Design a protein with these regions (language model features):
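Class I SAM-dependent methyltransferase SAM/SAH-binding core
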Residues: 50, 57-98
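A short SAM/SAH-binding and catalytic strip from SAM-dependent methyltransferases
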Residues: 107-122
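A short glycine-rich, Lys/Arg-flanked "PGG" loop and its adjoining helix->strand segment in the class I
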Residues: 125-137
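Conserved class I S-adenosyl-L-methionine
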Residues: 1-45, 58, 62, 82, 140-173
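A short acidic, Gly/Pro-enriched loop at the edge of an enzyme's catalytic core
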Residues: 97-109
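C-terminal lobe and adjacent flexible extensions of AdoMet/dcAdoMet transferase-like proteins
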Residues: 203, 207-286
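Acceptor-substrate binding/catalytic loop of class I
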Residues: 118, 184-198
Length: 286
């Protein structure tokens, strides 16, 4: 099953290089914040990680460097060809809704992409249930989503709101959570579903997973003008990170972030106690 809309495949094949995007410029904030949230929750030791929708392996790379065994599953052939070039990473062509992995076969699943490229709610819940199937009891599932308010804030921050056709995109995002790019302009992203924070939590719960944490990744800092330039200044970078961390769990401000990151856990097998690693208190957000 790889019936992904062709415009999504074309976007990641012909219009953008996802690895370069997230490793450069203002996306450095997104990358570093995802790293620290994931590392905060991971138990000690070498883990088996399934990176579903892992793209070119941008997250698989640092996880492998941390000593974990990482396998990328992605529906874009270009990504599957690129990911194995990273040390310690394997890959396969596949779909989040029908994974080839065996039941209970991994310690951690990343869903960084599938939920915002599956427009139907049933498909998103199906992907979450597949993640729950392949992760071991008490294992973790990390779920990324795009905030339904992202286009509005991006439009204001970068002046896109004043481009012909962009206000209509924003209106649909806010009304339905369905993002479309009829003019196929690369800077307007591609076909996607954008989440309200409450809806993301509800979908994860509907799949049978327990939500452990839900954070805003970038906060208002993600919309800072000239963020890429300020990021090069070490002192400014720490202030930017502080501003994101300070409000990451504030419910009234979650939607201000471009990206949401949920941490979910598969319930332990009936009659068994969680392992000691699962009972660890996550390190401080500060």
């Amino acid at each position: 099953m790889t019936d992904v809309p062709p415009e999504i495949i074309e976007h990641y094949t012909e219009e953008v290089d996802e690895g370069e995007r997230i490793a450069a410029g203002f996306s450095q904030l997104e990358l570093l914040r995802v790293q620290e949230v994931v590392r905060r929750h991971l138990p000690a030791g070498s883990l088996r990680v399934l990176d579903v929708g892992g793209g070119t392996g941008i997250h698989a790379q640092w996880l492998a460097a941390d000593g974990h065994s990482v396998h990328v599953v992605d529906p874009v052939p270009r990504h599957v060809q690129q990911a194995p070039n990273l040390g310690g990473v394997t890959s396969e062509l596949g779909d989040a809704r029908q994974l080839s992995a065996n039941d209970d076969s991994v310690d951690v699943v990343l869903l960084f992409g599938p939920l915002y490229h599956l427009s139907e709610g049933e498909d998103r819940v199906r992907a979450l249930r597949e993640a729950m199937r392949v992760v071991r009891p008490d294992g973790l599932v990390f779920v990324a989503a795009v905030s339904k308010f992202a286009s509005l804030f991006d439009g204001l921050a970068r002046g896109l709101l004043f481009e012909p056709g962009f206000p209509e995109i924003v209106e649909r995002d806010l009304r339905e959570g369905e993002h479309r790019n009829p003019d196929r302009l690369p800077h307007r992203f591609t076909t996607a579903h954008f989440h309200h924070p409450d809806a993301l939590r509800a979908e994860i719960s509907a799949a049978g997973l327990d939500v452990v944490d839900l954070v805003g990744v970038e906060g208002l800092a993600g919309w800072l003008p000239h963020l890429a330039d300020r990021w090069d200044d070490p002192e400014a970078r720490q202030l930017i990170l502080y501003s994101a961390r300070a409000v990451e769990a504030e419910p009234s401000l979650l939607g201000l972030s471009a990206h949401l990151l949920a941490v979910a856990r598969r319930r332990p097998a009936s009659g068994t106690a969680p392992p000691a690693s699962a009972a660890r208190t996550p390190t401080s957000r500060r």
